[in-house]
Regions:
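Generic, well-ordered alpha-helical segments
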Residues: 4-9, 26, 139, 143
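Pre-Walker A adenine-sensing motif
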Residues: 20-36
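Conserved glycine(s) of the Walker
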Residues: 49-50
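Generic structural signal for well-ordered alpha-helical scaffold segments
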Residues: 17-21, 152
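Glycine-rich, often acidic-flanked micro-motifs
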Residues: 31-32, 36-46, 60-172
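Charged, amphipathic alpha-helical linker segments immediately N-terminal to NTP-binding catalytic cores
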Residues: 1-18
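Post-Walker A alpha-helix
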Residues: 54-55
Length: 172
């Protein structure tokens, strides 16, 4: 009956799920996902960077933009090689638990800045941006390597950008 029990169990299940899916070309990532007409942008960054805020700005200023997940979406490489993102039972500051998916068009790593500037990341920078947003277990070599491989495979298809930005319409 203690609400903290539910929170603990929910977080534990989320962590176990994130580790269990690794060998199946899937990643649980820390991101906010905005969808527009079947295509998705994933906003990455550390907690407090503005991922939820940026997704909210897209919904405010871009007609038909919707929120797919606000905190812990699932990224998956499908059998045909397509990279898709899925909603899941874990949301963030904005409750959003959609049983839906979208084609991933880009990953955008956010950084707060007084100026808005978009830069395409390459090589190690793009890898670090996505890898640091994934859930993995260092002590489980098989799953850790599977996560590593899936990140590399995603990056062969999906561009990664860094968006230095203010929380305003111009950043959208």
């Amino acid at each position: 009956d203690d609400p903290s029990d539910f929170f603990f169990i929910n977080r534990l299940v989320m962590i176990v799920y994130g580790v269990a899916i690794a060998p199946h070309h899937m990643l649980k990532i820390h991101a906010s996902v905005t969808e527009l007409e079947g295509n998705a942008l994933l906003f990455l960054g550390t907690s407090g960077t503005g991922k939820s805020t940026h997704s909210r700005l897209w919904r405010k200023f871009v007609p038909r933009a919707t929120l797919l997940n606000d905190d812990e979406p699932i990224l998956r490489i499908m059998e045909d090689g397509e990279v898709r993102v899925f909603g899941c039972p874990w949301g963030g500051s904005t409750p959003c638990y959609r049983n839906a998916s979208a084609h991933v068009t880009a990953l955008v790593h956010l950084r707060q800045s007084p100026e808005n500037k978009l830069t395409k990341l390459r090589g190690r920078d793009s890898f670090d941006s996505l890898y640091s947003s994934t859930a993995f277990l260092h002590s489980d070599k098989k799953r850790h390597l599977a996560t590593f491989d899936t990140v590399a495979d995603v990056l062969e298809q999906i561009p990664v950008y860094r968006l230095d930005c203010r929380p305003d319409e111009e950043a959208v």
